[in-house]
A protein has these predicted regions:
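Structural motif corresponding to alpha-helix initiation and N-cap regions
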Residues: 34, 126, 148-149
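Glycine-enriched alpha-helix->loop->beta-strand junction motifs that scaffold or abut catalytic
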Residues: 44, 107-115, 131-140, 156-164
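Catalytic beta/alpha-barrel core
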Residues: 49, 67-68, 90-94, 113-123, ...
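Catalytic cores of alpha/beta
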Residues: 97-109, 147-159
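A short acidic, amphipathic alpha-helical/loop segment
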Residues: 11, 128-131, 154
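N-terminal capping/lid subdomain adjacent to the active-site entrance of alpha/beta enzymes
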Residues: 1-90, 96, 103, 107-111
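Conserved, mostly hydrophobic/aromatic
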Residues: 48, 79, 92, 117, ...
């Protein structure tokens, strides 16, 4: 499976097993995001990747507010309703929440069956990522910001993720 960075109106399909697409600049918009996702599904895409809590401006992990959690859940719920079971939801958070916030987010998103929760906490916080992974049914994904075999070895030893996404150019 390949995930490609995408501009707002990315329209070509890529990938072998699934055809992922990033929803673009409709992060956190519970009305626009589902329409965009449905548009891509109608074009034959079978997965959409998006961050329902963007934009956050903090540089270090933080607790998500109740309103941010509610909006994220509404975004994911509306996208799931728009695409049904024809499309996988790939949830990315850019490692913005702290572990407690990521766990609260995951609990709210579980009913919508996302394929993964990518970088629920900063990837260098392996212990906290493992804590999140143990606390949710959603598979945790990470790896594109890890650069050495030692970082991956720690990730594996702590069972911090079930989907590994190495950036092979690193």
């Amino acid at each position: 499976t390949y995930i490609y960075p995408a501009p707002d109106d990315f329209s070509s399909k890529q990938g072998d097993d699934i055809d992922p697409i990033e929803i673009g600049n409709v992060f956190g918009d519970a009305e626009r995001a589902p329409k965009r996702a449905a548009q891509y599904v109608s074009q034959g895409f079978t997965a959409v990747k998006f961050d329902p809590i963007m934009p956050m401006s903090a540089f270090d992990p933080r607790q998500l507010s109740l309103s941010a959690l509610a909006n994220a859940e509404l975004v994911v719920k509306n996208i799931r309703e728009a695409v049904g079971d024809q499309c996988d939801l790939l949830i990315g958070t850019h490692g913005q929440p702290n572990a407690a916030g990521a766990i609260r987010l995951a609990q709210r998103l579980e009913p919508y069956y996302p394929l993964w929760l990518e970088e629920p906490v900063p990837p260098e916080n392996v212990e906290e990522m493992a804590r999140v992974a143990r606390s949710t049914k959603i598979p945790v994904a990470t790896g594109e910001r890890l650069a050495s075999k030692y970082e991956f070895a720690t990730l594996f030893a702590k069972q911090a993720a079930s989907i590994i996404q190495p950036a092979l150019g690193r």
